[in-house]
Amino acid sequence: ASFYSNPKAVRIFNAYVKHLIGRENTINGKSYIDDPVIMSWQLANEPRGMNNVSAYKNWLTETAALIKSLDPNHLVSIGSEGNTSTPLPNGLDFFNDHDLKDIDYCTFHLWVQNWSWFDPLNAKKTYPKAIKEAKRYIRKHNKQAVKLNKPLVLEEFGISRDLNDH
């Protein structure tokens, strides 16, 4: 999470964001800003504050504002996985992270196997717990999104099948 407090890294990232948003679609010739094919810009996939929460929160705020200033026509989201069940301190605070004026909707991910709620080698025993925990996780995030008055998108979901042989 030192990225968020590294001025050079953030400067390079912001230059990339400006380049990307300023691009032209090579298929239809429209600038990305005016392209209806783009639904939303996302800050990152599963960004985490880890041991640098204040710098992370500042990065969320500034990056979302930068994107909105460059492209007011499209939605902006974080790409957050939500308040995961991992016991490690990850610097995530779903409600406060999404409570930013330039974040248009909330995102979360759901990985029942990764979070040890489901074991594909013991599916009969662990599937009921996976369903229970998944529903609880969804309700918890939905409740917070409602308080924020923002839509909620479950962006990623994963579970193994076929006895984990895939």
Regions found by a protein language model. Give the residues of each.
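Active-site mouth of glycoside hydrolases
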Residues: 1-116, 127-143, 147-150, 161-166
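Aromatic/acidic polysaccharide-binding cleft in carbohydrate-active enzymes
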Residues: 121-122, 154, 158-165
